[in-house]
Design a protein with these regions (language model features):
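Amphipathic alpha-helical effector-binding/dimerization core
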Residues: 82-177
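Short hydrophobic beta-strand micro-motif common in sensory/regulatory domains
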Residues: 217-221
């Protein structure tokens, strides 16, 4: 059988724990085509899409043309790019998931108590995704938009959720990742990262300053459900201004902690 024929059959192995009969490889490949586009690769040829998804050019082209017919992809005949219709997929999550809706009144409480933008964020792979936010009107045009994805290693919420992983999960992450440097303040060595994550785990909250953007500060606390399971992080981002780290923590941390505790029995 040719590689092209294989690419168009659902014959790839199912993930561990999923019966082969319940696995639709074509759906997995279609999603992987959408995920092949990113900041560094906003437009792709069929060959490039195939290389990024481990498909042949012919198979990638068929998925791209199918997505184009569905309205998720546009093309000039050579290059392909995502259309705004893709945002419907993320919007479906934000509108159907219970957590972003439940958290809104509490984010409003944090924003009112701190005069800063408050967020709920979750982990997806090595990134933090912001799934809810609330803040003063003067600030809502700044900060992270809903659905924004940021490397976990440089955010307070991301470092917090990394620190609260099991020892095995955290050690695996530390052993298999490379740190990206964004500013002169970014933690660039795994030894220093390991020490910082240990400190965060011990104190139960995280502070990150100027690791992704200069003059930006983040403070985060864990958000747990009634069973104690970590479901995300409640966090504030703010410009550093003239407020010291100690003063910012003293002002914001109690509000974050009280709000996270109040939410615990509702999620």
């Amino acid at each position: 059988m040719s590689k092209e024929s294989k690419d168009n059959k659902d014959d790839s192995p199912a993930p561990a724990g999923l019966d082969k009969r319940d696995w639709i490889a074509g759906l997995e490949r279609g999603v992987s085509i959408i995920e092949a586009f990113d900041d560094a690769n906003p437009r792709l040829t069929a060959s490039q899409a195939g290389q990024r998804t481990n498909m042949t050019r012919t198979a990638a082209r068929r998925y791209l043309l199918t997505l184009q017919h569905m309205g998720y992809v546009a093309s000039d005949g050579k290059l392909f790019w995502l259309t705004p219709r893709v945002l419907r997929l993320g919007r479906s999550y934000l509108e159907s998931a219970r957590l972003p809706r439940v958290v809104q009144p509490f984010l409003q409480r944090v924003a009112a108590g701190t005069n800063e933008i408050a967020y709920l964020s979750v982990m997806d792979g090595d990134e933090v995704v912001y799934i809810a936010r609330n803040g003063p009107n003067r600030s809502m045009s700044t900060g992270y938009v809903l659905g924004a994805r940021v490397p976990a290693q440089v955010t307070a919420s991301g470092m917090l959720m990394l620190a609260l992983r099991s020892d095995a999960e955290l050690n695996e992450w530390l052993a298999t990742r490379q740190l990206t440097v964004f500013t002169s303040h970014t933690i660039a060595s795994m030894e220093r990262m390991k020490l910082e994550l240990a400190r965060i785990r011990a104190q139960g909250w995280a502070l990150s300053e100027q690791q992704l953007d200069l003059n930006s500060r983040g403070i985060a606390v864990p958000l747990r459900d009634r069973h104690g399971t970590l479901v995300g992080a409640l966090n504030i981002t703010m410009p550093m201004g003239h407020e010291s780290s100690e003063d910012a923590v003293a002002r914001v941390l109690p509000v974050l902690r009280e709000t996270a505790q109040a939410m615990r029995n509702l999620i």
